[in-house]
Amino acid sequence: MRFLGFWLATAALFGQSFTPEKQSQIASFEKVWTTIRDKHWQKNPGGLDWQAIHAEFYPRILNAKSDDEAVAIMREMLGRLKQTHFGIFPAAVYNDVEGEGGGDGSPGIETRVLDGQVVVTGLEPASSAARAGVKLGWVVLSANGKPLAPVIQKLKSDPGIHELALERAVHSRLTGMVGGTIQLVFLDGANREVARDLELTPERGQAARFGNLPPMNVFFESKKFGNTGYVRFNMFLDLVRVMSNFGDAVGSCTQCDGLIIDLRGNPGGIGGMAMGMAGWLVDKPNQRLGTMYMRDATLNFVINPRAEVFAGPVAILVDGGSASTSEIFAEGLKDLGRARVFGTKTAAAALPSIFERLPNGDGFQYATANYISEGGKALEGIGVTPDVEVKLTREGLLAGHDAVLDAALEWIRKKK
């Protein structure tokens, strides 16, 4: 922040004082500029003279007539990078993503935003929602008296908000403190409004820690559909347990017709786990999923084949909630010709990125590395395009069908 101190000292020397609004604008600008200078993966961010960028944009911040104008100037500065995952989100939007709820308590439902509606796509069998008769395909209209539609419409209208953030905003409104209750109003299968008061119990899975992040519940499930193996886990975390479970699932499937790995809604986690899991699926040594470029290091996602490798067809299921390590895993195996990808385009958020709040209250997102898949594709801002695009629909869920899973099962059946 040395430039902020310099300019404020200079202003004081010449008898110029700044209003609190202007001080906030300057502090926010300096936060953005300094962060890019210090944390971008390129020493010259975007190939630019970043010092010259400061000299160009700082006077414009001083002359900005409003907070909106100052934010527009900062966005223009970030636009010079011509790189994704660098953005400023208005405080109101940032707050909408964070929500007012949140907590470790869940009514036991999973949801996705389908065609602008919050649709129930999963139910925990013993959850309060299941006991209350909630069904797949029901639409969640409101939580504790607050409609969800206005929030979704507002977030979807902001081009900087991707599906991952949208799902996060919904999730925060459908959770709360363990032991409490939440009132949800649904649209049932007959399009009738029904209200349910649901108990909030601990979210599915086991608590896992990663770095300085708060504990997060990680679950892993494995089952078979006929002779096709199926695994699903919600995050690439809890390394020892999840890797062990994945290995056991693959090991129990040596005679399976195929294997389905469901990464829908999986926001990623530890990148190295993608390499480890791929080792159970790729038998050739020295294969790579891709390469990550950081300021002081380059990380090759090299696959080390296991002693026993599953050789059958592999299908990976993805959607707009699949991000980071999920994208690295899916695109890497797709590029190597080892897996076929089903679903909808992923979050296009493969890079390690950080959200911070600026002094003016706005949200600031920035990336700290670049990633190129083995096929030469930059996933950031582009995402993984499925080999077979299939969308979940409310109608299908009400009828008991998961169209994405069904498509993968049909493909494996035809490969027999």
Regions found by a protein language model. Name each.
Residues 44-116, 178-183, 187-221:
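Extended, small/polar residue-biased N-terminal targeting/export presequences
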